[in-house]
Design a protein with these regions (language model features):
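Short amphipathic alpha-helical interaction segments
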Residues: 43-60
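Short alpha-helical segments that sit at the start of domains
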Residues: 1-26
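Minor-groove-contacting beta-hairpin "wing" of winged helix-turn-helix DNA-binding domains
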Residues: 70-76
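Generic structural signal for hydrophobic core residues of well-folded globular domains
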Residues: 23, 27, 84-87
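A short, conserved structural fragment
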Residues: 58-68
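Short acidic, hydrophobic short linear motifs in intrinsically disordered regions
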Residues: 29-43
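Non-catalytic, well-ordered alpha-helical scaffold segments
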Residues: 13, 17, 51, 77-78
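Short, amphipathic alpha-helical interaction segments positioned at domain boundaries
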Residues: 78-100
Length: 100
């Protein structure tokens, strides 16, 4: 049972890292400070639990979200960028940007 829980936690951590990395890379590519990006595009064909992950990352201070109907726009915070450069959910103390 604990192996299953560990596996689920690892998957959750990978999803959280994925969201932050996508935001980080989009921010770098666009050169846009505090740009807003469609979370629906980030999640396309990948995950169904958008609200769950948005809640976690917003609560942790890594991103800010804005709901417009069933569309969610998100932006990475400076704290989120720093996290991408120094750590990750799936491998603490190993930067997300060096894992992908």
């Amino acid at each position: 049972m604990s192996e299953l829980l560990d596996h689920l936690r690892n998957k959750e951590n990978e999803h959280l890292d994925h969201i932050l990395l996508e935001l980080y890379e989009r921010e770098l590519a666009s050169g846009n400070m505090q740009g807003w990006y469609s979370l629906n595009e980030i999640f396309t064909g990948q995950y169904n639990s958008q609200d769950y992950y948005v809640d976690i990352l917003s609560r942790e201070g890594y991103m800010i979200s804005s709901y417009r109907g069933n569309h969610i726009e998100v932006t990475i915070t400076s704290y989120g960028k720093q996290f991408c450069e120094t750590s990750s959910y799936s491998q603490p103390n190993v930067p997300i940007i060096k894992q992908m």
